[in-house]
């Protein structure tokens, strides 16, 4: 994404709009109200093959499978969960016979999911991705981007929770 797709005037306009939105909506940490949420319970993606997904997320990435049940809304479909730490789950559905197409980035859809990992585990995970032949890109020496077997983009980031590339975001 390094190629410039907008004129300098357009880029200046985008930055001016971000500045306006920050001024109008962003409050200093001490002035922000407490969130009404307590965390992400789970994010659910679609799997084309349950076993391939289990092998990728549990065996390669080290996220333990915690449950595998029938999808209550679609008989025959599986709903399964992986522990991604801090009492957060990554869930999947499969939809056998539904003919779900390949992953596509769409407006309102998932761009990527960033999962926090301990810095001391990050290098080992990157090494396992390399060893398994998974194409990946390392960014800022704390973040690695890759696609899962169904094309969903995943980022594993070793920055502290609430921080991104040295910037406090929480």
What are the roles of these predicted feature ranges?
Residues 97, 160-163:
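A short acidic/small-residue loop/turn micro-motif
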Residues 85-90, 97-98, 120-122:
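Short, charged/polar surface micro-motifs in flexible loops or helix N-caps
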Residues 49-51, 108-153, 158-161:
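Vicinal oxygen chelate
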Residues 46-89:
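Core segments of cupin and vicinal oxygen chelate
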Residues 27-29, 67, 76, 97-102:
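A short, acidic/glycine-rich surface segment
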Residues 2-51, 110-113, 117, 166-170:
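N-terminal beta-strand motif that seeds the catalytic metal site of vicinal oxygen chelate
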Residues 91-95, 99-116:
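Helix-adjacent hinge/juxtasegments
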């Amino acid at each position: 994404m390094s190629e410039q797709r907008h004129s300098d005037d357009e880029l200046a306009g985008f930055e001016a709009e971000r500045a306006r939105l920050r001024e109008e909506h962003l409050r200093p940490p001490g002035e922000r109200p407490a969130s009404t949420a307590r965390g992400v319970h789970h994010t659910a993606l679609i799997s084309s093959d349950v076993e391939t997904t289990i092998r990728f997320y549990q065996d390669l990435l080290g996220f333990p499978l915690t449950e595998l049940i029938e999808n209550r809304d679609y008989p025959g479909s599986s709903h399964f969960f992986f522990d991604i730490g801090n009492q957060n789950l990554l869930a999947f559905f499969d939809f056998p016979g539904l003919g779900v197409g390949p992953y596509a980035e769409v407006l309102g859809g998932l761009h990527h999911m960033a999962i926090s990992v301990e810095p001391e585990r990050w290098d080992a995970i990157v090494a396992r991705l390399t060893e398994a032949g998974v194409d990946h890109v390392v960014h800022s020496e704390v973040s690695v981007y890759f696609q899962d077997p169904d094309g969903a983009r995943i980022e594993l980031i070793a920055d502290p929770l609430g921080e991104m590339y040295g910037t406090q975001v929480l």
